[in-house]
Amino acid sequence: MSRRPLAVLLALTLATPALAQEAAPATPATRKGEDGIFSLDRMIVTGAGQAQNQFDASYAITALTAEQIDKLAPLNLASLIGSMPGIYAESTGGEVQNVYRIRGIPDEGSFAVIQEDGISPYPDNNGYFYKTEGLVRPDLMVESVETVRGGPSPIFASNAAAIVNFVTRQGGDTPEGAVRTTVGDTGLYRLDGYWSGKLADGWYLAAGGFVRRNDGYRDVGFPADEGGQFRMNLTHTLEHGKLTFTAKHLDDKNAFYMPIPLYDPRDTARSLDPLIDRFTGTLSSAQLKRASIVSSDANGAPQRELRDLSDGRHMKFNHLGANLDLAFDNGWSLSNKAIVNRLDMTFDALYSSNAPQDAAAYANSRRAAANAAFPGLSSLGYVYTDDGSRFDPASTDGLVIQGQYRAMNVRADSFADDLRLHRRFDWGGDSHDITLGVYGAYYARSYNSRYQSYLLEMRQNPRTIDLLGYDAAGNVVGGVTKDGVVIYGADRTQGKAYTSMLAPYIADTWQVTDKLRLEAGVRHERYRYRAWSMLRSTGNLGMADTLADDAARLFTGARARTALDVGVANWTAGFNYDINPTVGIYGRASRAHRAPSEGANEDNVNIPTADQFELGTKLNFDTLDVFATAFYTKYDPYNIGTSAVNPQTGAAESKDYRGSVTNPGIELAAVWTPAQWLRLDANLTYNDTKVSDLTEVVANGAVAVVDVDGNMPNRQPKLYGNAGPTLLFTTGAFDWETSLRYAYVGKRYADLENTTELAAYDTLAANILVRNGPWDVQLSVDNLTNTFALTEGNPRTDTISGQGTRAPIYGRPIYERNSRLVVTYHF
């Protein structure tokens, strides 16, 4: 895959004179720059009953405007929130479905609620192979993003140890808009736009979206990302407030980047880079754009369907909503947010499986089963599936590898409503801000999944191969594989789940003195789960000429029905003390529960709890803003589900583990502006996350102790953060901002036994922004030094015990150096 940063730089050089000729000189009235990545003077709306100044918040919150988001130039939502303190994010999985952890909670993001305008697009962030992250795509319609870590999160949202709220644009009296084009050396072409303004007396509109095509940051053999979204907010003013109707349509396909083999398992010092590029390589194959998936129908009979690997994670999401905001003369205010959504998703991905295997040893391990199945068998040999020609393992250093195709269909429908009443009371000389609310939701999800394991040559974008049996005359008598498939029906699931929930809540802010404020809140959630799933057995699909169907997961024709009713109570309490107008301290304790996901039943109900405690200080000086927080998190139980692929059968085998996690730490966000032309900003987190009391849940409810006490959770660094300078200057009619951002991620482990180490790494990003009147031109370069590093090992096999080596031989790399040129016209 080519990278052409010089071409992009040349485009910038050529574009600048043209802009200089057409644009008027920049003036403060035309465009006004922001003070920095972090500002305590910003009003926030997340985590509180009413909007408040960020300096007044009694909890850790980071707020970024659209302009500040643009300067960060995030690759995806995970990289955006990962730039904030207290949040560790892995953004290397692609556009969506990445990993992010809040203050060491190792749940891959299901304890963080992603919202748009104060309400989540789906009530459960942990969907079936999707997260609400995939339903929220930042574009020019985003006005700001606010991230609350801990604090009041469990009062104002369900399953929330943190809230990430994207605030969208609303129409106003003054029309405005922008058009943006983005091109990148990954084959990226993107067009964004929005317009907002007044339609008629009392009616206002904001509408916009994007379309995008991207070949991808790694070579998958076809376009990685293709699609876009459109959304609108239509507002009507009322006598005491406003009514806003919201709508959004998303239709987007995204590749899911997997770990790749890096070293030869027979000689772990030998790199596989000649076979698969460590930066851009994947095992994805264009040959699987017409994959024939054979699986069990509802009654156990074989069925065949064509799937397309290039569809990736294809999400079609439709949203309608209505937000009512009223302020009455008697001091009461009312807010009601109602949404109805539908998601239709197909998911096609080739998952990483076991490490590469010696081709001769692989064939020998299948010889006994082949001898038993095919009388007259004399030898085994490899051929390419597509044309039947001989495959010589010497062409891939004697290696073959397996990959598992996962094909899924998901439909999710939801309705949610959040009603709040707010009023300020004076009582005994003190003031109380009371918020009364009730959140209710109904959501249903159906799913249908088929797994099929393939045998591949060991190289980048491989072809599928077959291992066939021959008699003494060279005639084919059967196959270990068929059509490249090692095992049909490696896994098979289907079902539907229905969930309803109701959550009344109350929060009070008590202004005790001019300097001291106390806050408390409680939320009680009641869930009702009903679900069915197909019962399964293991059997044969009736293919006499192959071993590949001998251990298929088959439906029996019967259904298992489950039911569960459960309730949880979340709470928070905190204080804020302003020592003076520029220095404040705060403290907070909270408890949040992660309610069971859809389909839960009495046999598997398991409700993790996050107890969070924090103590922080805030500094708001003329040239320095600081938000520093010491925190402690206890997460129990810590649930781990692994789905490894058996190297002998190719079937998926699941195991469940349970333990506890504690995480003391410190997070810091700061901006220092020593001069008008210089700004320095930093976000830093240190946490000492440890696992204890880990057990494996085995047959009949028994447990087996796994000795990992005191170890770090897999893929969790102790130290991570970013920092960098920004220079601001003017040359003639052009205003410039140039910045460097240094990012550091500390040592992590691929496994809970802490045997396979993911080395610490650092990267450097550069950004050049030039403004002239209504024009912005921005050049962003990520991983400037082309650092190679890994964000994970191979979770299908190494979550508990590692890869048998100190350094990983299989892993998912960060993206190589890449650049983007962004041109925006504001009007």
Q: Over which residues does each language-model region extend?
A:
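Acidic/polar loop-and-plug regions of large Gram-negative outer-membrane beta-barrel proteins
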Residues: T235-T237, K242-H319, T346-V410, I465-A497, ...
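Short acidic/polar hinge/loop motifs at secondary-structure boundaries
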Residues: S120-R149
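N-terminal periplasmic accessory domains that precede
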Residues: L77-L80, N98-R101, Q115-D117, K131-L135, ...
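Extracytoplasmic beta-strand/coil segments of soluble accessory domains associated
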Residues: P28-K32, T46, N53, I61, ...
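Short strand-turn segments of transmembrane beta-barrel domains in outer membranes
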Residues: S144, G151, I163-K198, L205-V220
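Structural signature of Gram-negative outer-membrane beta-barrels, strongest in the C-terminal barrel
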Residues: V410-A412, S431-N475, T493-Y635, T673, ...
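Gram-negative outer-membrane beta-barrel transporters
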Residues: T582, Y632, D656-L752, V822-H826
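C-terminal beta-signal and adjacent terminal beta-strands/loops
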Residues: D636, A675-R679, T685, A743-D751, ...
